[in-house]
Amino acid sequence: SIDGLGASLGLPDFERRDADVMIWQYRLAACVTDFYLYLNGDDYVVTGWAWRPPFVGQSMDEERCEQQIGNLLDANA
């Protein structure tokens, strides 16, 4: 749920809403991670996610990205 995502990772760095879909974006040094949330009844639920390098044409260190996401989880635990 959107509440669970916010409790786990904190508020996003960027948020976009279109009709019944919302994207929460977290911008980390190693990657940018987007979570896709769709309206299901009265709540938004996470239905998918994607990550990419912070800059176009740059390679991404997936292990470092995972570590930074883990750090966000730890900080909000």
Predicted regions and their residues:
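Residues within mature, well-folded domains
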Residues: 1-77
